């Protein structure tokens, strides 16, 4: 296996890194502007040409109908498509072009083909969104060896420098998503305690607040129709770029000026912070909720706060967190690059564990013995690491199964709860209803209810999202009616989902393939890959 690249597939910007021969994570800058981050914007320029990055972003003001941005907010949803040149593209398709552009820039800069990757996603992403992210990588022709949470990746980047055990809060405010994660860090181990967030809260919301203020002031000064502005896609695309730039300027200046149709509109920092205070408070509320979840596991406090994500450069973020958590050190953790670097380090970590397993097998010892020997000798493992890092994660959502209650009424019962450690296996006791039954219907729903937050942990249908509803087959052969069986729900370290069925009496277990309702099929992935292989990407 060659280099394993770490990719931060962001809502507004993306980044790719690798670990060099000295064990140092290195970000590959893009070809267009030599920046470490690439705008996550896709321009379907023509039927046979797609542009990604800064040039695509510039097309928002000239060709907005053919430009797709912030697609990450839609990933994992089957009903959304972006249409260009008569073809409808699912979020996985669009995301694959961003991944393809990152890989293309690596080839241009390093002369090396990107094959094996670790891709990050928000900690608050559910199973469908994680699966869709993996599918995007497959469409791009990449071997996705792991999906890892963005805050965990940032903690890996930070944690490898930690000399003593610490409990940290990773406050990750990106361009389109927000995560807050409580993590215990010590040499050789990173343990996620609790996570929360909002995948529709990010820097774009602050941009939109500026845009709303600009349009309001413009209408007030000119008397023009507000609807005419909102209906003009070129104007709105132009404002999208200008408002993002104004947000950045307001992080270091007292005011910013935006020109709309020859009219100069001034936005002051005071106005901006007042108009977006509710957004910041929403993130603070999530930190409180996540701290409360961590407290259920005995973690009552944190030693420091790490700021991750480009939107944390807004000074009001650090100010508000200082007020909320007085006397807690607040550090910037390389907001733009730490996630991709952490993902690359995690990839190197996977290689290190494989090397350890090989050493253990050759020496006739277990892996832990080899680890201790490596620590004593100081010998550097592959990728320059002195020891592997064990990452312990949690599931970010709760999962309910549709079952009959004592009155034979179908209800949703939560069996897996948010912030449960993964990997996990959750057996659900059932029984066959007829002799030689070959299948069993299973309906699984994702939700945000925590343990004990509803009576008997029953979840209302309107508060849950259907993940899958299918006949699972084949069950073990020749089961009589009333045979006890277990449906075993499994979630792995990456937050991906599978199901087994077990004959309790006979001890036989059958693994069942699961097709999530919103997930692209292998055939659809292959068709998309073949299509994009014939399209020029730049």
Question: Where are these predicted regions, by residue range?
Answer:
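Oxyanion-binding/catalytic loops of NTP- or PPi-dependent enzymes
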Residues: 1-77, 84-88, 104-538
């Amino acid at each position: 296996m060659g280099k394993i690249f770490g990719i931060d597939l962001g809502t507004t910007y993306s980044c790719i890194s690798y670990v060099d021969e000295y064990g140092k994570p290195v970000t590959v800058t893009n070809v267009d502007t030599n920046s470490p981050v690439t705008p996550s914007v896709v321009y379907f320029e023509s039927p046979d040409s797609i542009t990604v990055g800064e040039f695509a972003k510039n097309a928002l003001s000239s060709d907005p109908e053919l430009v797709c941005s912030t697609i990450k907010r839609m990933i994992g949803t089957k009903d959304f498509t972006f249409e260009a040149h008569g073809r409808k593209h699912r979020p996985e398709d669009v995301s694959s072009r961003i991944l393809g552009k990152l890989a293309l820039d690596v080839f241009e800069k390093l002369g090396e083909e990107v094959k094996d990757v670790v891709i990050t996603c928000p900690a608050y992403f559910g199973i469908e969104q994680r699966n869709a992210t993996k599918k995007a990588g497959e469409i791009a022709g990449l071997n996705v060896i792991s999906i890892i949470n963005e805050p965990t990746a940032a903690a890996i980047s930070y944690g490898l420098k930690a000399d003593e055990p610490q409990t940290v809060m990773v406050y990750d405010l990106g361009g389109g998503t927000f995560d807050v994660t409580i993590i215990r860090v010590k040499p050789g181990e990173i343990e996620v305690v609790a996570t929360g967030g909002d995948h529709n809260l990010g820097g774009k919301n602050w941009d939109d607040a500026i845009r709303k203020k600009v349009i309001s002031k413009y209408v007030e000064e000119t008397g023009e129709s507000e609807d005419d502005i909102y209906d003009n896609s070129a104007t709105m695309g132009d404002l999208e770029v200008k408002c993002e730039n104004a947000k950045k300027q307001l992080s270091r200046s007292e005011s910013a000026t935006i020109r709309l149709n020859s009219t100069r509109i001034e936005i002051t920092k005071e106005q901006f912070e007042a108009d977006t205070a509710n957004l910041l408070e929403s993130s603070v509320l999530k930190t409180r909720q996540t701290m409360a979840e961590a407290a259920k596991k005995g973690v009552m406090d944190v030693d420091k706060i790490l700021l991750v994500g480009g939107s944390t450069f807004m000074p009001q973020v650090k100010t508000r967190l200082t007020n909320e958590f007085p006397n807690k050190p607040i550090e910037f953790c390389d907001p733009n690059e730490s996630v991709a670097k952490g993902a690359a380090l995690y990839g190197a970590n996977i290689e290190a564990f494989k090397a350890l397993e090989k050493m253990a097998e050759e020496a006739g010892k277990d892996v832990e013995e080899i680890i201790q020997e490596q620590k004593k000798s100081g010998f550097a493992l592959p990728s320059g690491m002195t020891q592997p890092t064990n990452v312990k994660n949690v599931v970010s959502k709760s999962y309910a199964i549709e079952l009959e209650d004592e009155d034979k009424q179908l209800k949703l019962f939560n069996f897996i709860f948010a912030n449960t450690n993964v990997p996990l296996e959750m057996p659900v006791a059932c029984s066959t209803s007829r002799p030689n039954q070959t299948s069993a219907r299973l309906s699984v729903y994702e939700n945000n209810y925590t343990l004990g937050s509803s009576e008997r942990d029953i979840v209302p249908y309107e508060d849950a999202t259907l993940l899958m509803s299918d006949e699972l087959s084949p069950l073990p052969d020749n089961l009589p009616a009333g045979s006890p069986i277990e449906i075993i729900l499994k979630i792995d370290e990456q937050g991906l989902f599978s199901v087994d069925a077990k004959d309790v009496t006979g001890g036989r277990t059958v693994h069942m393939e699961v097709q999530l309702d919103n997930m692209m099929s292998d055939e659809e992935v292959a068709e998309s890959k073949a299509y994009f292989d014939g399209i020029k990407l730049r």
